Amino acid sequence: MRRRNFLLVIFPLLLSFLAQSASASELRTWDQLQGTSPKGYVLLFRHAYAPGVGDPENFRLNDCSTQRSLSDLGRQDARDVGEWLKRRQIDILRVESSRWCRAKETAELLGLGRVKLNKNLDSLFEENDIANHPQTFQIRKQIVAHRKNSGLLIMVGHYVNIAALTGVGLASGEGVLVRANRNGELRVLGATPALGR
């Protein structure tokens, strides 16, 4: 009984310690990039919080009124992450976004420069075999090609797309930092902080 009680106490503490260690490691990567023009780094960022799942039945790409929209909290989260990145003083090569309105608005609210739309970042929520989808292939190819470029490339997209590329499941308004190695494999190097979310 004593052993069981000990485990009930120590296990949550261990999980907390491991989470803090992982978070500290991820932030160290950002510390190393501070004030630089990093070569080959890409931030895959999930759009900020937009209540709901998937897309409404009447979804139309060019009509934001038919799509899920960011909540006020989601908009503030996007601004906060943008300010956090600005304080890092990392050179931004470009900000790209899915054509979905919630992704575009997130990218714009980051406030890190003009947003370029990239159809290969569009949501694959309704698709099968996302890992082998042509859009996933094209984004992976773009990240590999970015190895030769300086400046952080920011790509704002969707949960399923990013998970297919990295194996990481992101909450709304979170991002994962990746870089391709010489073999074209994507390495996960860090993540954006929760910033109180």
List where the protein language model places each region.
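N-terminal export leaders
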Residues: R3-L7
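Bacterial N-terminal signal peptides
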Residues: V9-F17
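Sec/Tat signal peptide C-region and signal peptidase I cleavage site
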Residues: L18-A24
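Active-site-proximal alpha-helix that buttresses catalytic centers in soluble enzyme cores
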Residues: S25-K119, L124-E127, V168-G196
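Generic beta-sheet signal
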Residues: G40-V42, G151-G157
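Short, surface-exposed amphipathic charged segments that create phosphate/polyanion-binding patches used
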Residues: D129-F137
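A short, acidic, amphipathic alpha-helical segment used as a generic capping/interface helix at domain edges
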Residues: F137-R147
